[in-house]
Amino acid sequence: LKAELEDVRRTRGLHRTARRKVPFPTVALVGYTNAGKSTLFNRLTGSDVVAKDLLFATLDTTQRTIRLPQGRPAIVADTVGFISDLPHELVESFRATLEEVGEADLILHVRDIASPDSAAQARDVEAVLKQIETPVGPNGEAKTRRILEVWNKTDLLDPETRESVLGQAERLRTQGKAVAVSAWTGQGIEP
């Protein structure tokens, strides 16, 4: 198993090296398990990756190329969901995902804003993100990492809570910190 994980890590390293030579920005979707990363990935890319309410429904990083509104291509990566107190035996399995996240130009931190545990889950994800090395550009320079919170599952909120969340998100959106969406319905996702 360790040899297979090392082989996967080596292969992904070669892919990342090749991508660094291509001037496409990369966007990584990260978040707690079941936050809706795969549903958002499908919405953004027109893909049909498995999106289920299951622990580890996504077991590997999936990438697709999209066109940004300005017509510029970008690579979007759907990653494995995080969980609290990940068993030590599984940490190694997640290393490849974390390496992909470390290379991203933009990290979309997808949160299940309807979950009563959303704030605690966000702290868990943020703690992991702080441990990831700063990405390096094609010439060895440190790249600036930008993180945008995506408050997902607004469709599951009661009307009063939804109005409050949308107001908070709008204030943070103007600062480039958060957006509120429903990946399921497409609400809040601009073409």
Label each residue range with its predicted role.
Residues 1, 36-37, 155-157, 183-191:
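Conserved GTPase G-domain signal focused on the G5
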Residues 41, 148-151, 191:
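Tryptophan-centered motif/residue detector
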